[in-house]
């Protein structure tokens, strides 16, 4: 029996896995998330997702003398409009990001990586969703940033929380904007013999 491991401390990703009924444990990775290789956004999120998953796969692979089989899920999300935006560094950075996104379309990219500790077979993929932000007044931006909600989110907003009122429309997977594209993840899990709709 394979055991699912989520290589992420994101509460949103945990909630999404619970939503589709997966049993899993959380093991955090210790990787550097900087873009030292100057990769394009779609490459970067897959690269970081893989690094997270690989780091955690190495940690859990030797449990029980390697008798247990683990399927490690790594993910990384960025927002892209002219540049790559991760989580804001501070309050001012969050304000700058929201002003940059105001009144325009941007892309949310989530890279996913799965690694099977049995043979370290891996697969990576990326999901892209387009999001149109409303025209935001300075007062709205400052009030939203003051909620502290943006500080741990790529692009400085959370579509599943108060940030929902900032969004005009989206094209593509909503769950991708939250942090984990569930349809794409389900397809990847099938490649490793795991069905969301059937008990493992």
UniProtKB/Swiss-Prot annotation:
Its cofactor is a divalent metal cation. It holds the Pfam family Maf. InterPro entries: ITPase-like_fam, Maf-like. One of its GO terms (cellular component) is cytoplasm. It is an enzyme of class 3 (hydrolase). It is found in: Cytoplasm. The keyword ATP-binding does not apply. One of its GO terms (molecular function) is UTP diphosphatase activity. The record marks 12, 77, 160 as: Important for substrate specificity. Keywords: Cytoplasm, Hydrolase, Nucleotide metabolism. The active site is at 76 (proton acceptor). GO terms for biological process: nucleotide metabolic process. It catalyses: dTTP + H2O = dTMP + diphosphate + H(+); UTP + H2O = UMP + diphosphate + H(+). Its main location: cytoplasm. Its EC number is 3.6.1.9. NCBIfam families: maf. Belongs to the Maf family. YhdE subfamily. PANTHER family: BIFUNCTIONAL DTTP/UTP PYROPHOSPHATASE/METHYLTRANSFERASE PROTEIN-RELATED, BIFUNCTIONAL DTTP_UTP PYROPHOSPHATASE_METHYLTRANSFERASE PROTEIN-RELATED. Nucleoside triphosphate pyrophosphatase that hydrolyzes dTTP and UTP. May have a dual role in cell division arrest and in preventing the incorporation of modified nucleotides into cellular nucleic acids. This is dTTP/UTP pyrophosphatase.
């Amino acid at each position: 029996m394979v055991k699912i491991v989520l290589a992420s401390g994101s509460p949103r990703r945990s909630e999404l896995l619970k939503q589709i009924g997966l049993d899993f444990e959380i093991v955090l990775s210790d990787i550097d998330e900087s873009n030292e290789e100057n990769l394009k956004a779609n490459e970067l999120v897959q690269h970081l997702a893989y690094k997270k998953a690989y780091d955690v796969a190495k940690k859990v692979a030797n449990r029980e003398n390697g008798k247990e089989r683990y399927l490690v899920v790594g993910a990384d999300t960025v927002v892209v409009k002219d540049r790559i935006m991760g989580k804001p560094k501070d309050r001012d950075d969050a304000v700058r990001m929201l002003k940059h996104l105001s009144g325009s379309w941007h892309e949310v990219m989530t890279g996913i990586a799965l690694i099977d500790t049995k043979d370290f077979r891996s697969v990576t993929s990326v999901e892209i969703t387009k999001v149109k932000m409303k025209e935001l007044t300075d007062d709205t931006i400052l009030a939203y940033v003051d909620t502290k909600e943006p500080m741990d989110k790529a692009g400085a907003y959370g579509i599943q929380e108060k940030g929902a009122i900032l969004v005009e429309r989206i094209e593509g997977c909503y769950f991708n904007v939250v942090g984990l594209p569930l349809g794409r993840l389900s397809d990847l899990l099938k490649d490793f013999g795991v069905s969301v709709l059937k008990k493992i």
